[in-house]
Amino acid sequence: MTVTVRFAPSPTGYIHIGNTRTALSNWLFAQKNGGKFILRYDDTDVERSREEYAQAIAVDLDWLGVKPDRVEYQSKRFDVYGKAVEKLKQAGLLYACYETADELERRRKLRLARRLPPVYGREGLKLTDDEKAAFEAEGRKPHWRFLLPNFEADPFDTQRTEVHWDDLVRGPQTVDLASMSDPVLVREDGTYLYTLPSVVDDIDLGVTHIIRGDDHVTNTGVQIAIFEALGAKAPVFGHHNLLTTISGEGLSKRTGALSVGSLRDAGFEPMAVASLAILIGTSENVSAAPNMESLAERFDLASISKSSAKFDPAELDTLNRALLHEMPFSEAQLRLAAMGICGEKAEPFWRAVRGNLDRFKDAVHWWSIVDGDLPETPDPSEEDRVFLEEAFALLPPAPWDHQTWKVWTEAVKAATGRKGKNLFMPLRLALTGQAHGPELADLLVLIGPERTLTRRP
């Protein structure tokens, strides 16, 4: 058996880091088990689904390093779902209902007032052909509900009916089908809700494992019943915890908040996003994995907590810095060249500045300092100006190397009596225009004698 998983986003908005958690969990599970990863767009909601969102999802996944083995669109598979609908109708497991939303709400309130569970009472099953014809004469069209197998002989005498599965994350799980309403699978306009196409596709595409958020736990009991009604064995399920904002709110892809695209545009490294999406809310230490291979080694569904995890953007900043500070030049070289940072100075430059970067693009700022004209620098005090004039007069002759800074500052210290911050800060400001930054021993060599002299006060 080939392990086959799927990530099934609805292209009604941009994916956020919470969706990324699901996508990466499936991708890494497939990688660890020599399996296949299917990207399936759940685009049966024709009104809200957009191709632009589907394309954006593909771009986001590619940026993260997720490469689907197969791509499917549910909107192109309606004929397959139609056959499943007919099979369920023939088996007497799909029945027509004509209630309006208002009528259903009134019934729900009435059941609550009678201290009954607010589940659908299967009134549609009681309709005669004449009653159905009368509704349709009024212009009503039926929606279709799946008859849950929560009774022995009489569908109006429901019995506790437990569905069990061994969840990859949560362990043994049980749901009672008697506590649920028969789910609507087909809308009045003939379009399909999520549940049926999802099951049909999982059967048709050979999905062996379903890994998704724990907001689907209850759905799983219903879907297992539909799998069995269609004569198929249900896949293995795993339900990971959900990510929330710091304030505990759910993440919404339609708001664009924390979307993968916005994180990419903000300059975060893909492995920073992937590391946090996978490791947060687990027993693993949240630290940056340099590549997917190392993240896969740390990925373990059994380590995921059963409570929700709060996404803190500050953690993403920390991981991003850690990745940049350890990134080898071989990995950074092409990206640096694309920003105009190349030549023999590029590698020593990268080694010098990477430890001070929050974002990769910040390297451009430091390149302009070592290889360009310095922007305006703070005017030194008169005392510092005199000090700098004396210091620049003591610059060692070329050629310079990494000992030049030490030789120079020791000479300046001996001549001026300054030491510590009083010595180093005026020199840093004069050379870089910045109060903080990479080691000046590294920068001085990169700036070079000629450019250094232009920064003399």
Swiss-Prot record:
- Which NCBIfam families has this protein been placed in? gltX_bact
InterPro entries cross-referenced by the UniProt entry? aa-tRNA-synth_I_cd-bd, aa-tRNA-synth_I_codon-bd_sub2, aa-tRNA-synth_I_CS, aa_tRNA-synth_I_cd-bd_sf, Glu-tRNA-ligase_bac/mito, Glu/Gln-tRNA-synth, Glu/Gln-tRNA-synth_Ib_cat-dom, GluQ/Sye
* Name of the gene this protein is made from: gltX2
Broadest EC class assigned to this enzyme: ligase
Q: What does this protein do?
A: Catalyzes the attachment of glutamate to tRNA(Glu) in a two-step reaction: glutamate is first activated by ATP to form Glu-AMP and then transferred to the acceptor end of tRNA(Glu).
Q: Motif 'HIGH' region, which positions?
A: 9-19
Q: Name one GO cellular component term.
A: cytoplasm
The UniProt record lists the EC number as 6.1.1.17
* Membrane-crossing segments per the record: none
Q: Which residues bind ATP?
A: K253
Q: Which UniProt keywords apply?
A: Aminoacyl-tRNA synthetase, ATP-binding, Cytoplasm, Ligase, Nucleotide-binding, Protein biosynthesis
Species this protein is from: Brucella anthropi (strain ATCC 49188 / DSM 6882 / CCUG 24695 / JCM 21032 / LMG 3331 / NBRC 15819 / NCTC 12168 / Alc 37)
Question: What family is this?
Answer: Belongs to the class-I aminoacyl-tRNA synthetase family. Glutamate--tRNA ligase type 1 subfamily.
| Signal peptide boundaries | none
Residues annotated as coiled-coil are none
- Tell whether Coiled coil is among the UniProt keywords: no
The UniProt GO MF terms for this protein read: ATP binding; glutamate-tRNA ligase activity; tRNA binding
According to UniProt, the reaction catalysed is: tRNA(Glu) + L-glutamate + ATP = L-glutamyl-tRNA(Glu) + AMP + diphosphate
Q: What is this protein called?
A: Glutamate--tRNA ligase 2
Please tell me which stretches of this chain the record labels as motif 'KMSKS' region.
250-254
Q: How does it assemble?
A: Monomer.
Q: Name one Pfam family in it.
A: Anticodon_2
- Which example biological process does GO assign this protein? glutamyl-tRNA aminoacylation
Instruction: Spell out the subcellular localization from the entry.
Output: Cytoplasm
